[in-house]
Amino acid sequence: MLDLAFVRANLELVEARLRARGQNPAELLGDFAAVDQHRRERITEAEQLKATRNKLSEEVARLRKAKEDASAVMEETRQLKTKIEDLERAATEAEEQLRERMARIPNLPYEDVPTGASAEDNVEVKRWGTPREFDFAPKPHWELGEQLGILDFERAAKLSGARFAVYWAEGARLERALAAFMLDLHTREHGYTEVLPPLMVNSRSLFGTGQLPKFAEDLFRCEDGEPYQAGKYRENDHWLIPTAEVPLTNLFRDETLDDSQLSTSLVAHTSCFRSEAGSYGKDVRGIIRQHQFQKVELVKFTRPEDSAAEHEALTRHAETVLERLGLPYRRMLLCTGDMGFSSAKTYDLEVWLPGQQVYREISSCSNFDAFQARRAGIRYRPRGQGKSAHVHTLNGSGLAIGRTWLAILENYQQADGSVRIPEALIPYMGTEVIESRNVAQGAK
């Protein structure tokens, strides 16, 4: 959430940055200035009447002490009390209107974020690794996985419907090996603290990280007998997490951290659940876009002056996973029109997929500035200062396990259909190659 005082003092700048995002400021802000002015005027009037009431109360006391009639002054005091209550109620209603507007306004992009309308305007920052030259036509991961008997879409559809997968044998082991490898790397070398959070969170948590109220349709809500009405939710509703960013960030919700606790770096391996409401017809083959998937998530809480450097560090931590696995990738700086709702600056890491001849996103690393901290009430007390301030929050995938899994299949496939295991994963896999096991080829 943006700072109300900042928006009030910099309304033209806010409108310009929203336009750079491809947003309509008039639609988002509405009559923000008028409502804010109305609220401030009602507060001022109420304060003035309170001062008058206090003087009248003193007059009542004086009259009573002098044993004089104070009824007229007391009646005036009662009338003032009613007027003050009406003014305060009007100010509260205006503040609620402002909060509702502010909750739906996205973060403002940093000045060094390129202006653009879509992914076509993102800027490539770097490339690592040279895509392998094959002496045969490389296959996409869905063909490789089914031929090896380690990926089963037919049975997954029988169990759960579209956009689910069953992993068999070495396929399941490769997912587990990737998670263990990533967690070990981030905790042992990058200084993250591992957390195992709940997979269900309340509405307040999703508001804190920015998924609610605007993106409820992208989430899975857990039914509790109460009929759900689109666009309406309750504070105690439970939702399946779309990413571990949500529980990790909200661990410190409504808390004030000590300066010595920053920067704090957390990592979690969890299942993630997304409805993919707006992706009908996209990536219908393979495991690029699933309702349920595994991810290792990185989250940082930093001082404002450290967040830019910590953003670069977090992105490098995600890149290190790809480099250790020998997977070619590129880093993209997202333009204003392609950024997430809560982000002030985002790098996407895109891995090369030879079976599809394309780079695909495998990690998104974002600096949220104080946007999430303001929504979630996460503050810290700077050393030597009495007044607290909002922390900056950052997060990134370190990495999406399913997409790393498919990238290994496509980049390490052999002419005979087998798949070599990257050297860094051999200790976790206990084998150097995945060959066809026909595990999933039973009766159908």
Swiss-Prot record:
Catalytic activity entry: tRNA(Ser) + L-serine + ATP = L-seryl-tRNA(Ser) + AMP + diphosphate + H(+); tRNA(Sec) + L-serine + ATP = L-seryl-tRNA(Sec) + AMP + diphosphate + H(+)
UniProt KW Chaperone keyword: no
Subcellular localization, as worded in the UniProt entry: Cytoplasm
Transmembrane regions: none
Catalytic class of the enzyme: ligase
Pathway info: Aminoacyl-tRNA biosynthesis; selenocysteinyl-tRNA(Sec) biosynthesis; L-seryl-tRNA(Sec) from L-serine and tRNA(Sec): step 1/1
GO cellular component: cytoplasm
Residue sites binding ATP per the record: 274-276, 361-364
NCBIfam families xrefs: serS
Domain characteristics, as noted in the entry: Consists of two distinct domains, a catalytic core and a N-terminal extension that is involved in tRNA binding.
Protein name according to UniProt: Serine--tRNA ligase
Encoding gene per record: serS
